C-alpha cells in the first residue's frame, strides 16, 4: 500500500509479474513520475487534495482491496502529502496524515495483519514538519505492536 505522494512506479514495475502480490498506489496524478507504471490499483488524486477528500478516497480504496485476503500489509508511508511539502502536490495537514496512518494501522487490529512500515518521501520546508510527521507515524505504530 503505497501512500507516498509519488506513484510507486518502481514497486509496480518490479512486482508486475507477481500475481500473489497486490500493489496499490494512491498518489498525486500530476506529480512525478510523469510516465506512470501500472499497479494493480492506481488511485490518482488532484492537486491540492485536502484531508477530507483524501481520507474518503483511502477508505474507499481499503474497502476495494479487501485486506483480509492478504498475509501482511507493506505500508509505504511517505509524509510528502503534507501541505508544506516542497515536492508534493497534495494539501494534507499533520492531523490528516495521522488519520491516514491510523486507518492503515487499524488493518492490523481488524484483520490481525502485520503492517510493515517503509519510510517514504518528505521534503517539507521547514524540514521539522517532515521530522514531526515521521515521529507521529512511528509513535502511532508503537501502539499497535504485538
Predicted segments, located by residue:
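A general "terminal functional-core" signal
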Residues: 1-146
